[in-house]
Amino acid sequence: MDCWQDIKTPQAHLQKSLDIVREYLPWEAERCRDISLTDDQGFLCGRFTPMVRRPVLTLPSGRQVLGMADALVVNDPITGQGSNNAAKCAKVYLQSILDHGDRVFGRSWMEQTFEQYWGYARHVVEWTNSMLLPPPAHVLELLGAASQSQPIASAIANAFDDPRQFAPWWFDAGQCQAFIQTHHQHAA
């Protein structure tokens, strides 16, 4: 559904959304017959180029500052990880500050602290980037299995809170098959 590049107005956005509903969710189209935007600012359209920035910036004064969360790790919003990333980054940084005590908070500490956060965030990046591509056959199989298995559906939903849980079964066809089989065996 990468079809938003020419959408410039609220009405065009609403119309494109309704076209998508009619094409992919026709059983819901009738329910959307009288739909309208709440206001002319009630839409969002854009894209983000995923990137990871250097964590430490030197200001004109010579002081160094440590960036955090989505100021450093920019993801497409498709997986809704912006708030998660900010909270997870703040937790990592706070613990690193507390552990560091009264020592100097220099570039080395800042880079090490970011690396601790990156240990989590790299999984968010990998998963989010995978969602920008057409799903491979094993992910389609996984989603189909989730529609028939509450434990599999729960595993997927719960991994939104900690995308590290998606590895390796989201990314590897063999691991995915084993994941599905294990959950089916436990359900039996």
Q: Would you name each region that the model predicts?
A:
Residues R22, R31-R33, R47, R53-R54, ...:
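Arginine residue identity/basic-tract feature
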Residues M1-C45:
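Conserved FAD/dinucleotide-binding core of flavoprotein oxidoreductases
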Residues M1-P10, R63, A69-V73, S83:
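Residues forming the flavin
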Residues P26-R47, E115-L133:
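A broadly tuned preference for mixed-charge, low-complexity surface segments
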Residues P55, G62, T79-L98:
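A short alpha/beta connector and helix-capping loop motif
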Residues C45-P77:
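FAD-binding beta-loop-beta segment adjacent to the flavin cofactor pocket
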Residues P10, S17-E23, L37-T38, G80, ...:
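Intrinsically disordered, low-complexity segments enriched in Gly and acidic/Ser/Thr residues
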Residues T79-G80, L94-A188:
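C-terminal helical "tail/cap" subdomain of flavin- and related membrane-associated enzymes
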